[in-house]
Amino acid sequence: MDAYDLFTSCRKGDISRVRYYSCLCGHEELVQYLLANGAKCEANTFDGERCMYGSLSDSIRRLLKEYKCITAQAMQRDYYDHFLLTLLEQGQYSDVKFLVHGETFQAHRCVLSARSEYFTAMFETKWKGKNLIPLKHPLINPAAFGAILQYFYTGRMDIDVSHVEDCKRLAKQCKMGDLIDELESKCKQVYEFVSNKPGTCVKVLTLEPHSCQHQEEMAQLADCALPAELKVGFGELPFDRTDNFPSYPDICFRVEGYDFLCHKAFFCGRSDYFKALLQDHFSEGEMMQSQPSTPVLTIHNISHEIFIRLLYYVYSDDTELSPENVFDVLCVADMYLLPGLKRLCGKTLAKMLCEDNVLHMWKTAKLFRLSRLEDQCTEYMAKIIERLVEKPEFADMIKEDAGAVEDRHETDSIPLVDDIRFHITSNVQTFSAIEEANVKLDALDQLLSTIGLEC
């Protein structure tokens, strides 16, 4: 390719020529970078086949075929999705089994009731009191039933194209109009793609969750768990069914005299603290008088208001945080081993950053190991360093951070100072910005000299 011709076309605004050259840009290094950072090209899926068809060289095509990547879900980047998938696959604390033409599927009544009005009705009528439910109808395909369960639990579905019609039939029976629409839309996409790209083979349809609907419906279980006297003001969802379906609780948490009817599957799956607590606690525990089969566990050192915030996080991966409660929730999240809730608190604290609290926020981030919040604090410090160096508390923080470095020598670096210097000098591109950065660095160096530190 003539580089001069390309540059001339760019200057002239010859878009058609630039587009022609761009189609030749098959950079193998870029493909490797994308794959290493979570991009995926799954064989026999619609998106995967489209990606393979569009490969610009044989080397890239081979790279896509041979790359054994761990997907974002397998790497547990989204802990909530991973928890729900594990709950489905392992069936821990399941309270119902479906037998479909010789195949057994473990499930949880609470999840199916929250996600489907059809299952809610069936559990209270035809299937009431049954722990093993045989589904003998010849048109019920086990693979399609498994895909429907996957959709209930995760909002996602992976289904062989040969089973799509079976899935749609089941979805119709379960009154899942939205799922039918999604399947038909995806089938149309695949048909149009395969028609225009001969030689491609799509064997698996994948539906990805495109909204928070399944989280909102799981939050109904938190609504149900609330004691009647505390329900006013909480759990106000657009389509509130909490008065119309039982949630089948198997554990009662008593907090400040209030009884929260919950599920071991969620609390044990979300928190190792509760997992250990519930597995070790009940040899001769207290039982509820109204529900003799439900054990009671009294939780101390937490207010019922903060427990409610934890409750909604456990069920829906989200909760309402405010400047008034975020520090208390953060302490509870740390104590109950809920790293996702800690990160949620970190995001809320980051929105509260100001000159008056940045030093306290940095200490909080260090204490609770919130690396993202810690970095945001040092970035904020870099912006106001000329005023910050005048505060004795800031000098004390630097001394303390220097003292935390094991076997530190006089000229060794100090993590806090290094991070501030990085943010001062990053993205400096103009002469005026360089001058401003130098003034800030001089102010920081002068403070270090005053307190007798070098780094």
What do the predicted segments below correspond to?
Residues 17, 29-30, 60-63, 118, ...:
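Conserved ankyrin/ankyrin-like repeat signature
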Residues 20, 32-40, 66-69:
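Ankyrin repeat domain, specifically the short helix-to-loop turn at the C-terminus of the second helix
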Residues 61-107, 152-162, 185, 189-264, ...:
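N-terminal BTB/POZ boundary and linker segment
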Residues 99, 104-106, 111-177, 248-261, ...:
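Canonical BTB/POZ domain core
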